[in-house]
A protein has these predicted regions:
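A structural signal for multi-pass alpha-helical bundles of membrane permease subunits
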Residues: 1-221
Length: 221
């Protein structure tokens, strides 16, 4: 169940924040190029390095985040990110959302730039608001690229080992394990048959995702 929640929640926030940033960067803003490069930094950093770095930030004893909370005026206590509900679920999601937004942003920005501007001009002449134009022109224009990036996001997130392993290591008591980290965990414990079973399950699910992606990709239509 947690694997499904992990995948859905991450891809949802990847898409929403990626779309929001893509819409902003699609405007003619001063310093847009520099802002775009800055937002690509999380994507440029290898995911395991990002996960290790964030694990220090969230460390309960000497982590940067808890030190900031302790320095704030008021009664802010240190948070046990790795053992306190719901933070041991929230923390790896924050890390993965931070790392995954740039991909969605770049892909959706490319889709936005492919929508003819005359459609927006015609809608403006007809009296449509920006919000109405967004739902009538932008979202339909992004349908193909949205389908592609959401499916790819599901495939990558479902099978993403590094973030869980280098932050919570599946803890506490295996509660944050997803299928791929659980398979690795039982393999290390010498339960080879169970690890192989989970490997087959993961492979089968990824095959289904891949078939759906292939069927819904533009080349197959």
């Amino acid at each position: 169940v947690w694997t499904i929640i992990w995948t859905v929640v991450n891809v949802f926030f990847h898409y929403v924040f990626g779309l929001l940033l893509a819409v902003v960067l699609n405007q003619r803003l001063k310093g847009r190029t520099g802002f775009r490069l800055m937002l690509l930094v999380p994507w440029a950093i290898p995911i395991y390095i990002s996960a290790i770095g964030w694990s220090f930030i969230f460390n309960g004893e000497y982590g940067l985040l808890n030190n900031i909370l302790a320095a704030l005026p008021g009664d802010f206590s240190r948070v046990a990110w790795y053992s306190e509900f719901p933070w041991y679920y929230v923390m790896p999601i924050i890390v993965n959302v931070w790392a995954g937004i740039p991909f969605m942003m770049v892909a959706l920005l490319g889709g936005l730039q492919g929508i003819p501007q005359d459609q927006y001009e015609a809608a403006k002449v007809d009296g449509a608001s920006r919000w109405q134009s967004f739902w009538a022109i932008t979202m339909p224009g992004l349908r193909t690229v949205s389908t592609t990036v959401i499916l790819l996001g599901c495939i990558w997130t479902f099978n993403l080992f590094a973030v869980i392993w280098f932050t919570t290591r599946g803890g506490p008591a295996g509660k944050t394990n997803i299928l791929v980290t659980y398979a690795f965990d039982v393999f290390n414990q010498g339960e080879l048959a169970l690890a192989a079973t989970y490997g087959v399950i993961i492979f089968s699910i990824l095959i289904v995702f891949s078939l759906v992606y292939r069927r819904m990709s533009p080349e197959s239509q």
